[in-house]
Amino acid sequence: MESFLTEIQINVLNLRKRGHTQDEIANIMGTSRANISMIEKRARENIEKARNTLSIYNDIIAPSKIKIDKGTDVFSIPKIIFSKSDQEEIHVNYSSLQIMEFVNQNAQRYIKNRMVVEPFVVTILQNGDIFVHDYEESEENEKMPKKEI
């Protein structure tokens, strides 16, 4: 399978996942720890670029985007998502509890004490998956109008 990672990067990441140190990996591969460090760093950079690419692509193809405004109570987010998905006739693949968990894991930096402190966007894909990303990032990708949902 084609990938943004080289075989060596994949091997290094697999060994790191198994708990090996960079020194141990360097000994296994017959190279220096500094080289392994650079290989791992570039692999992680490539992974981040791939994630960003997917985020941009999902933003482009998404039939529905919801701006979650500053001051929104976190507990109202599932209702907002379900309301928008019903309007768009998209079945969201998650329950309210799963959405709350998803928001907690993926939008922590936008939330404090149950309240949204920085606006963000929830993207709903046609297949019912949801993603969270920066509001500014979404504006750049599609010049999304600033309106309350």
UniProtKB/Swiss-Prot annotation:
It comes from Methanococcus maripaludis (strain DSM 14266 / JCM 13030 / NBRC 101832 / S2 / LL). SUPFAM superfamilies: DNA-binding protein Tfx (SSF89915). Keywords: DNA-binding, Transcription, Transcription regulation. The lineage of its organism: Archaea, Methanobacteriati, Methanobacteriota, Methanomada group, Methanococci. Pfam families: Sigma70_r4, TFX_C. It comes from the Archaea. This is Putative transcriptional regulatory protein MMP0086. Belongs to the Tfx family. GO terms for biological process: DNA-templated transcription initiation. Putative transcriptional regulator. Coiled coil: none annotated. InterPro entries: RNA_pol_sigma70_r4 (IPR007630), Tfx_C (IPR029291), Tfx_DNA-bd_arc (IPR004645), Tfx_DNA-bd_euryarc (IPR018384), Tfx_DNA-bd_sf_arc (IPR036657). GO terms for molecular function: DNA binding; DNA-binding transcription factor activity.
